[in-house]
């Protein structure tokens, strides 16, 4: 009995997100090719794969997407073409406009560097958009998913920023005030964790 063909994905960008996503998908049985996000090779990134994940800085997504050839050398004219996807929380699918098949996957998690990156993606909440193939990526990562339409992207990203960035800034302020009264920062963190648990249980 022949083994089923493993889905093929090319990940552009070797930063935290790209490395973590590549490791996680490789562990889930995907055929993964992790390459730098810039260089002459980008033009042929869609060749021989069903999915190209752009894991580059938000400001570079449109530029890199435009450099990926929709019909790379060697591709059959009858092939539907690879899905081009990004992992940016703030960007719509419009930045991938040169391509007919587009998608987005934004994990709602802080991805650490190193071996822990892949583990952080497994089971994480993920915002999906576009081509249904992206659902297969989320399923491979055992992600908990929801879909966000382009017209609601700004509101989604604002909510994510409030939940993460604003909370970090607020706790930093609380720690500084606590320090002025010789109160351990751990006490404030424990208090905040309890408050968040109550919010979760509402």
Task: Describe each PLM feature range.
Residues 21, 28, 116-201:
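Internal alpha-helical scaffold of NAD(P)-dependent oxidoreductase catalytic cores
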Residues 34, 86, 104, 127-128, ...:
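Structural signal for conserved beta-strand scaffold positions within catalytic alpha/beta enzyme cores
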Residues 9, 32-33, 102, 145, ...:
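Hydrophobic anchor at the start of a short beta-strand
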Residues 1-48:
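NAD(P)+-binding Rossmann beta1-loop-alpha1 motif at the extreme N-terminus of oxidoreductases
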Residues 19, 23, 39-117:
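Rossmann-like NAD(P)(H) cofactor-binding subdomain of soluble oxidoreductases
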Residues 29-32, 81, 99-101, 142:
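A generic structural signal for alpha->beta connector loops
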Residues 9-11, 54, 128:
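Hydrophobic Val/Ile/Leu positions in short beta-strands of Rossmann-like dinucleotide-binding domains
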Residues 5-8, 81, 123:
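Phosphate-coordination loops involved in phosphoryl transfer and adenosine-cofactor binding
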